[in-house]
Amino acid sequence: MNRRVALAALVSIALLGAYVHAQFGNQPAKLDTIKIKDDLFVIHNDFVPGNTTVLVTNEGVVLVDDKFEIDHENIMAQLKKITNQPVKYVINTHYHADHSGGNPKLQGLGAQVITSQQAREKMAEIKQPGMTNVTLDNSLRLFIGGKRIEMYRFGRAHTDGDIVVLFPDHRVLAAGDMFTFGDATPQLIDYAGGGSARDWTGTLDGALKLEFDQVVPGHGLVTTKQEMRKFRDSTLTLRTKVHDMIAGKKTKAEIEKMLRTDFKFADLHIQRSLDGLMLELQ
């Protein structure tokens, strides 16, 4: 990557973060807590920011994603409803601020942050507060309070640093934005962050080989492995349609209309994904 391309990518990453924060991170989200198991919960909200998964142990709490910084106090209030244990670890499924913005305040309370190496590099590029303390390449296991948590990176999808977090004793997967569900948000390929429409399907195939029944999506309500399979199929349909339209000499405007109609792309998705899709799938 030459210096000009690298600079353009860096600016794009920063602009995406600024856009999302300006649109959704300027006031705290209304949160509620959903119980999955006796010791496993989701702090949920509508649309943005992302879901926060909570594992409670007798040695402390593990969070998967921690929303925007402005949501910190509300997250802590939700945690106090279910436990007095401190937060020991925060696992970010990727670098975006609606999943990692709470890192600095939680680190100030003693928590350690875990991400993929790729996510840490993106955080460093944009000088994002709350940098990672521990990174993983392909997998990592965490043992706390007699419970096991497994983290995996299967490849590029929403970004190049996406990881999934498996709670094997509960057969629950926290998928991050590799999988979003319902009307929460359609597939967003963050090309500036290393995302890939071509690789996304195979990355999901890797995650789907894990043993789980329920899924916490990056955005949307807790759902099933079958719904994640359906989402996987939709990623294949999307890239096939775009590729075929490019091969058929369809215009950019025609492809945009198809994405808005068939895949519920909003302005953000068009701005962040359309040019990259056309370049990657030509």
Locate the predicted segments by residue.
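Bacterial N-terminal signal peptides that target proteins for export
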Residues: 1-10
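Accessory terminal helices/loops
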Residues: 13-24, 208-211, 222-282
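Metallo-beta-lactamase
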Residues: 28-31, 35-36, 60-62, 67-70, 117-161, 168-169, ...
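Conserved beta-strand hairpin/beta-sheet module of binuclear metal-dependent hydrolase folds
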Residues: 32-78, 163-167, 172-177
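Active-site metal-binding motif and surrounding structural segment of the metallo-beta-lactamase
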Residues: 33, 57-62, 70-112, 210
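Divalent metal-coordination and catalytic microenvironments
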Residues: 39, 55, 65, 79, ...
